[in-house]
């Protein structure tokens, strides 16, 4: 939490919020700044972050989402943003970038451009459209475009810029030999020629704005898993060149390329936990920390670069305050760059400074924010319903203190209790199980711990409602008579959904384990062992045969399949709907998990009809043809159904009765938290 400098800019501490698009713009804004975005950044500044980097729209001449800085007309809006950030004593930077070969991928834009035009069969990212190679006059125009954008940012009152030369964006296509096949002055012949465009941009920014206008250069420290990708030795050389050009700090993260064995389906990400999911790769890239499922994975890269430069080095990627502190104290880096943890809790820096680590709302690494952003949709957070709604969701004291009963100790119930207690209500929470968490411990067991950390959410919510004085009643089922005795003003039912058991011949057979029965058994074991230990024990023994058919190919079925594959089962997924994977995040998570399942030999069948279950297995029909899938065990993993029985029985008991979460409409954790946060602000 000590202050430091980037160039002449003094930071409050060593935590930087990097420049990631939040997409709070609307069509009516036409690229101009709006109050929603300003409110979010002001809240982040108020939360104590050392330096805030605001996002801008890509520097292309097109109707793209985001807040633009390509013309002078956008300066006044950015001036308001800079003032809001400065209001709470935080320096303000803005990121500038050009999407390059990614241009037409997620929004309407001109065809992509890059250092070279590479056929799809040879491309590092074959599902990108083939990009057009930039001629030298256009390269010089782009250098000027970056320089003018930085000039506008300075006029708006910002203290510096973050130059994004990483990921798969335009500038990285020059730095990387995998993308750059040119033979001219900007070609692949030397580090200097590959870095030439970035060097010229930094020099132009300094020429236009003076040497005191700070520049952070963001680069890929390595392109892990990519043939001819950037190596640490190369990024060390790039860092030296960019420092010589005038960069005031070097920001480092890894780009992870996830290749299948046949090398035909390549994807990449700068989210390291995806590289470790559903299981770590057999061969790990050099200089990557693999000890924490992706947390701190890029620290060794940044540490290597720090040895080669005299300017501060920033590490980006999945990080925690504890690992960040260790990396800074050991001299491996000077700053940590966070995004998702700060979206999950804007007050993270203030809480770290106060020693209140247990009060930090944890990022569970669900990647919901990234998935929304990749679709150019407003970014929201699984655990922080106030993200993007900072002004509307500011906690306000209740006009009248009420006695509030919350039924259910899952995420919806605990979030409701937390917010209601913050507003001054007297809150009583009832959970029929002996522990809080609802279905989250079971979800943690099945999901595993390679990517998501849902257990941290349980710990956080439990800690908060305990500190706020919520009266927690475990092992008590709510009945009409209990409510009549308590006489609350408000009842909020968050009791979870019910398991759907299909009406099918043979469903009661000995080989069948319905989701209801599976949950009941696992919950019993969870009481004694906990999710982490039980996760290990199930790798030794499970009450399931070798061949398993999963009825239901949505998110629960796919995650269950991965869970069973890791435990040596041969799995078949059958789904009545149009596709496998409904409910999984469309970007990264779904394609990566489905490819992994396919590579592991999982058979996935959609558009089927369940016919019957016999001792041999499950009989289905598909396209008019019947077949029996032989199985030793059949597991149902169908979507939950609403559970309205308690709601119906209590409607006439108290003035206000609400149903939220899965008992109203089964969805995901983000929906449960959002439901609880919303309803608790209205009572």
Language-model regions: role of each:
Residues 345, 350-351, 416, 562-574, ...:
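Internal hydrophobic alpha-helix adjacent to the cofactor/substrate pocket in enzyme cavities
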Residues 410-412, 435, 497-498, 554-556, ...:
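Residue-level detector of alpha-helix initiation sites
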Residues 1-407, 411, 415-422, 426-427, ...:
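Flavin-dependent oxidoreductase catalytic cores
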Residues 187-190, 275-290, 389-398, 456, ...:
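Surface-exposed acidic, glycine/proline-enriched linker/cap segments
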Residues 556-563, 583-586, 590, 660-683:
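A conserved FAD-binding loop/helix module that cradles the flavin
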Residues 453-501, 509-518, 523-546, 565-649, ...:
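A Rossmann-like FAD-binding core segment of flavoenzymes
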Residues 425-441, 569-581:
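Glycine-rich FAD pyrophosphate-binding loop
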Residues 409-422, 535-569:
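Rossmann-like NAD(P)H-binding beta-loop-alpha module
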